[in-house]
Amino acid sequence: MPSEQDIASIPHTLLGKQRLASLADENGDIDSALLAFQWEMDARRTLLAPAGIAEIALRNAIDQEISNWWHNNSFPGTWTDKNIPPEATILKPFVHPTGWEKRASKNLSSKNRPVNHCDLIAHTSFGTWKNMIGNPIAINKNPPTEKKKLDSWNAAKQRDKECALLWKNILFSAFPNIPGRAQRGKISPRAYIGARVSRIAALRNRMFHWDNLTALDIKMRYRDINEVLSAINPLLGTWLDSSYESEINQLIDDKPSWLKPYLSKK
């Protein structure tokens, strides 16, 4: 049986001195740190399902529109095939069938059939779709003076041009219900979706890498998810709220009072 001293050391072993200090109340109470850590665990569990739903809806909506465009142009096969015709070069910067096939093959439940298009789509990363849309408002309008930073800025600008072209020709139709200018402000429809998808991606990374969630604005990140789903189909946003909004609100209410206030980044 572990001794009382062994049991007392568990929080330090689990979280480390710095993490304990960041979670504890103003008195540095160990029990308060463990309670805060449990809230973080609950936050991950509560946010995971909505974030997963957003990923599934996003990839299916984009795949559907690219597939429609592909077939409307009478291209052979599917857009995830290795040989993209010259007329479809707009997709080349974003399509990586060899890597997708390797990932899908590893996770295929049955090894007795070849990997198909649906398998590839199901096993893509969230970043695949985020990178197709881009996030234009994240790119500084003014080029930096330092050469290394300027090279990165130029590469980001070029990539964003490719995203803008893909959006203009195909992806815009995956989000037919983006709010009008009066609601979304001065940003473009692509920027509206891109900013939200990028924040959802950052949220996923924080959850999966076990980063600190105490400063996260839970309400705003859930709102990002809802707004992306609603832009695809308003019924998705309504269904999400009916399934998860009360749990999200309860999570916010249950946040320990001594934790840092939210850092709201819209």
Q: What is each model feature region?
A:
Residues 1-203, 208-218, 223-266:
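Amphipathic alpha-helical interface elements
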